[in-house]
Regions:
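Short, well-ordered beta-strand segments
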Residues: 198-200, 363, 388, 455
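Active-site donor-binding acidic/aromatic loop of nucleotide-activated sugar
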Residues: 253-255, 409-418, 435-436
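Alpha-helical solenoid repeat scaffolds of the TPR/TPR-like class and their adjacent stem/linker regions
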Residues: 1-359, 376-377, 402-404, 420-424, ...
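Glycosyltransferase donor-sugar binding loop
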Residues: 231-236, 387-400
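Short glycine-rich anion-binding loops that position phosphate/pyrophosphate groups of nucleotides
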Residues: 279-281, 368, 438-439
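Catalytic binding pocket for nucleotide-activated donors in carbohydrate/polymer assembly enzymes
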Residues: 426-431, 435-473
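Short hydrophobic "strand-cap" motifs at the C-terminus of beta-strands
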Residues: 202, 364-367, 390, 414
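Short donor-sugar binding/catalytic loops of nucleotide-sugar-dependent glycosyltransferases
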Residues: 18, 205-206, 366-370, 393
Length: 473
């Protein structure tokens, strides 16, 4: 009884339930069925786009979102999905245009403002622009917390406040906004007696990234006597991902899982020791870890710019240069320093040999967000040519930030298309100039491995002291 209309209503209701509970594969199947049954339903195309994006299918998400917009141009949420899909497809300027188009129609749209600010910090290298954009949202209860977090993260790159003031603000933010409600998880049972402890890694960066180059040697050692359980929060898959997979006893893809569900998933995995390798690159995972879903938890490489502000970690893994004992007041986590250095650099097989004769032009090879006002002002006083190397310098607005501060006369930009190409460019030069306040971590180690010299600076935060071990060496 009821016929096709009732049947359609039933599976559509089930699809919405799956969507609300972030059961993405089931929701995807339901809305795909809905789109087939009701091809003129903008809402179904939009919800299908949401699922496709969550499942790491950005091109399909873009197409579905644009179909929804064609059917209902006023459906601004589909413009957001379109922009986020374009970002995932490596088309940030098109993504920015999508968000800007939405803001032309709705100037106070908080989601679009935050999305543009994210691109400003993480792609175009203009954190101060991001701060100016989100400041009005501090008065908007629906978006104030996200705006505050954006300002805090931008301040890591360029700020007027002290390290202590920023760390205190981060701790206050985490206490207010990053802690899941108490009682979400039952008390953890005592650790079981077993020959191989269960060691969990959680990160969106199980790929060609500092997480691979600075931690894989450690995990290869740990895997000899422990079962490695990976909670993968990222969609990028490459040769480094395969290296992590080769060590994993269990591999869980939990990319779009909300914080409470993620905390429960980790809890159910019966983890003895968990290492967070995402940090502020993944605030949702940090929120999940606020519930202490593993018996012991440590913060290590990956978004390890400054304290998480959480009191559930058993330690912050650092070393005497980056997190000296005297800096404990900057951390909510107990500092656990590794003698001789907190990480071991594993070079890729394509690391070029150091040439005998190196070029004198100094190189600035850094995420453009690290090019602070103070650093660029210092650089402007340095005579002679400078070479800026990063794929993000392909964007005019990113280059313009440098040219306005340093001048165009002695500036050259190179935009390598791969990590391998970047290393080949870097290794031809004698000097790498480190940035401040946010310093080079992996890049400085790569430079030294290729026989380069590094001009370093010293700050107080963890991310401001990455290169100090080079001075000691």
């Amino acid at each position: 009884m009821g016929g096709p209309a009732v049947e359609s209503a039933n599976f559509l209701a089930q699809a919405h339930l799956h969507l609300q509970q972030a059961r993405w594969p089931q929701a995807h199947d339901g809305f795909a069925r809905a789109v087939h049954a009701m091809p003129q339903s903008a809402a179904s195309h939009h919800n299908l786009a949401l699922c496709q994006l969550a499942l790491g299918k950005p091109e399909m998400a873009r197409q579905s979102a644009e179909r929804a917009l064609f059917l209902m141009p006023s459906l601004w949420q589909s413009r957001m999905v379109q922009g986020n899909a374009l970002k995932s497809l490596g088309r940030p300027e098109a993504a920015d245009d999508a968000f800007a188009q939405l803001l032309q129609a709705q100037p106070t749209n908080g989601e679009a403002t935050l999305a543009r600010a994210d691109l400003a910090i993480n792609v175009f290298g203009t954190p101060l622009q991001a701060v100016e954009w989100v400041k009005p949202l501090l008065a908007d209860p629906a978006h104030a917390a996200d705006a505050q977090l954006t300002i805090l993260m931008a301040s890591v790159y360029d700020r007027d406040s002290s390290a202590a003031e920023l760390s205190t603000a981060v701790m206050a933010f985490s206490k207010q906004h990053l802690c899941l409600p108490g009682g979400l998880l039952p008390p953890l049972p005592p650790a079981k007696l077993r020959s191989r402890p269960r060691v969990a890694l959680i990160s969106p960066l199980f790929c060609v990234s500092p997480v691979y180059f600075l931690t894989i040697a450690g995990w290869r050692h740990v895997a000899k006597g422990s079962d490695i359980v990976v909670f993968n929060r990222g969609h990028q898959l490459d040769w480094a991902t395969e290296q992590f997979k080769s060590l994993a006893t269990e591999w869980w893809d939990v990319q779009e899982m909300p914080a409470s569900a993620l905390a429960q998933r980790v809890y159910q995995a019966d983890i003895d020791v968990l290492y967070d390798l995402g940090g502020w690159m993944d605030p949702v995972a940090l929120q999940a870890l606020s519930a202490k879903p593993a018996r012991e938890m440590y913060k290590w490489v990956g978004g390890q710019s400054l304290t998480t502000g959480l009191d559930t970690f058993d330690g912050w893994i650092g070393d005497e240069w980056q997190s000296p004992a005297a800096s404990q007041h900057l951390y909510s986590e107990p500092i656990v320093n590794i003698p001789g250095g907190y990480a071991t650099y594993t070079a890729p097989h394509y690391l070029p040999d150091a040439p005998v004769h190196k070029r004198a032009t100094p190189v600035i090879f850094s995420n453009p967000a690290k090019l602070s006002r103070g650093f660029l002002a210092w650089l402007a006083k340095l005579p002679g040519p400078k070479l800026f190397v990063h794929r993000q310098f392909r964007f005019e607005r990113t280059r313009e930030k440098v040219v306005q501060a340093v001048g165009a006369a002695n500036v050259e930009f190179l935009c390598p298309t791969s990590h391998r190409e970047a290393l080949e460019v870097l290794g031809r030069h004698e000097w790498l100039i480190d940035t401040f306040p946010y310093s080079s971590g992996l890049t400085a180690r790569e430079a030294v491995a290729m026989g380069m010299k590094v001009k370093t600076f010293t700050g107080e935060l963890f991310c401001e002291r990455h290169s100090l071990h080079l001075k000691a060496g």
